[in-house]
Amino acid sequence: MKTYKTLAGIGALAIAAFATITIMKNSSENPQEDGFIGRSEITVENGHMTPEVLLAFGRLSDPQMSPDGKHILYGVSYTSVEENRSVRNLYICDLEGSDNQLITKSDKSIVNARWSSDGKHIAYIKGGQIWTAKVSLKKGKWALSDERQVSNVPAGVGEFKLSPDQKKVMYISYVKSHVDKPVDRHADLDKATAYVSDDLMYRHWDHTVLEIPHTFIADFDFGGSEITPDNSVDILAGEAELYELPTEPFGGLEQLSWSPDGKYIAYSCRKLVGKKYAFSTNTEIYIYNVETGACQVIDMKGGYDTDPVWSPDGSKIAWISMERDGYEADKQRLMMAYVDWTKGEPMVWGITDATEDFKYNAAGPVWSADSKNIYFNSLAEGVQGMFIAKGPDFDAPAGSKIKPAPWKVERITDEDMWYDFGSPFHVAENEDGSTTLYTTWCSMDFPTELMAVTTSDFGTRYTSITLENSHILSQLAEHETEARWLDTVDGKKMLTWVLYPPQFDPSKTYPAITICLGGPQGTLSQGWSYRWNYRLMASQGYVVVLPNRRGTTAFGQEWTEQISGDYPGLNMQDYLVAARTIKAEPYVDKIAACGASYGGYSVYNLCGIHGDVFDAFIAHAGIFNEEHMYMTTEELWFPNFDNGGLHEAEFDPRVGTPECPVGPAGDGVTFGGIKQGGSPWSTEPKAVRHYKLSPHNLVCNWHTPLMVIHGGMDYRVPVDQGMAAYNCAQMMGVPSRLLIFPDENHWIIKPQNAMMWHREYFRWLDQWCK
């Protein structure tokens, strides 16, 4: 058994070392605007973490190293529950983190901040437009001056990225989609609220798709030349269809990368629309000529190809790739291609899987300065570490028939470090031959902070930079976390985290919570969450059990893929193994199961099969009726594969012709020209079993108190799933409660709604488990 205390190891040392000197200096040269939300000075009573304490934490993000490598620009969001909003402002710190200064005091969130190459300006987004300002350091104080808005884009700017010479900018804005509003069809109906669609993908995540993102290019200078639609170029101009760039709903400019000379852009795009879009994950990497608009494709003919990054010398491109179309949890391979410039235009050759012999997923690729190696992060055995893919010493000449030499992957962060590390945002090669990776880190015990990881022949050194929340963390009572490897019903090993309440005494008894992970493909790692916060749950007096059941993504692809086509099967037994194991401990009394999304499906399923294991359930945004879910969710590739189809997305181009009329193809899986092996009308055995064992078919077995939570704007798992589950619980005479948030999506985001969620969550658990 391996046990760490809260903020164990370097976390505890960092808090002890800097808690007394981490002071946010507010320069008088930076005026405070009405509506500014600053750092919370909350007092924690008796070391007890509460939802109020959770929402008081500052949320650090998007660090950017200064051009001279001496300072870091980053943002922190603070929340006012009373005002029901959060505001993000900017900070600058030195590399030791002992001089953190607040440099903006805006009443509107400031995001996407970037340095000028001389370090004298920054550009950022405020109020949906690009702004610039001068930044200066005088007598130890940072100050902004000469703020000016440099974009005037009516549809708004979502994000921007400057070219390497900073003479151009690419930015995300929005164009009309295929979905019509009333005034698009009837000019006199300007107060009507309907929408009209003749194809799929008319809604996505939490919104009607009335507009889609496109990426535009414009000239840029920090002096303030205005950027407008009239002087911007749409990268997708001239395409036959309305494609997205970047891909909805969460894609950003990490999906586009400037070449080192600024003349080309590599980007990821799914050039599909309507039904084909809804059933496919096939994005490709394209190379766009900024001057001519010409475009070429790196055609992988598979699933997601995302996150392209040019090497600093322009000789290579790296990206993340999934092999199979329609399967969004396929292995994330780190791909690399050579770029030949001998004919003036970039010609791609020698595509190589740099992680071919690495069994985990890769994410967040970052090139080394010499263009020989690629840094990335990966969830491996329950924690997210940093890795390096080392390129071969010798590259085959361009156009050579010699197969490029393999790459070698090495771990950078130590295997026993119970923290999640991001990819580096800056890599520094030091005079002594060591390399320092500036990155982010967090754990179940503290939110994201900045960290420097220095590697050399003598080992790895970790240096905490920021401690934005040390004033809160230092007030909280410590607790213990344990990693258990449990035996599954089929003789495999399953990592299960267990968090114990503060002042845990094994001679006493405590209630427990088994967490059912969403996804279903994901991982219960050392991440920090403001929605499902396990330290908060432990602080409420619960033993928190986190089983990395079948389908989780940090234990190799075989463990991940087993769940597809087997939702009612082994992963449900994994939950029961974890729950029965902890319930057998003398210090555990009653136990609940709680989960969101697929975790909500798990809860509804366990309601019908658990017998007398659990004493209460909470399902948030859970799938209840799989048949109806297939017909109402938006990204249809997901249930089509995972519900038992297990096929790559395939389309019959002959559909609608005499030789292939619309309708069934006679193979039991192809309908409307689309292979729908995971549909309710499929004859695939796994799909038939999947729908037969949908949770709604097991409600006659329900007898345990159930709370149902759902967002009214959830289009991934529509709200009627939760309403149906609650109605059935009521019909079965099961004690039940319904909590609906009409203005929230799959997640509960607004501060007062988040507070309501937490209070009602614990009220239900306390009622039935304490």
Language-model features: locations:
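Active-site-proximal cap/loop segments of hydrolase catalytic domains
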Residues: 538, 546-770
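Short glycine/acidic-enriched loop and turn motifs that connect beta-strands
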Residues: 78-82, 176-179, 272-275, 323-327, ...
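Hydrophobic or amphipathic alpha-helical targeting/insertion segments
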Residues: 118-182
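Conserved beta-propeller blade repeats
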Residues: 57-72, 107-123, 154-169, 202-215, ...
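Beta-strand-rich domains and repeat architectures in extracellular enzymes and scaffolds
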Residues: 52-88
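Short loop/turn segments that connect beta-strands within beta-propeller blades
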Residues: 94-98, 135-138, 220-223, 289-293, ...
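Cap/lid segment of the alpha/beta-hydrolase catalytic domain
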Residues: 459, 468-590, 596-597, 631, ...
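Predominantly five- to eight-bladed beta-propeller fold
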Residues: 30-37, 88, 174-241, 268-271, ...
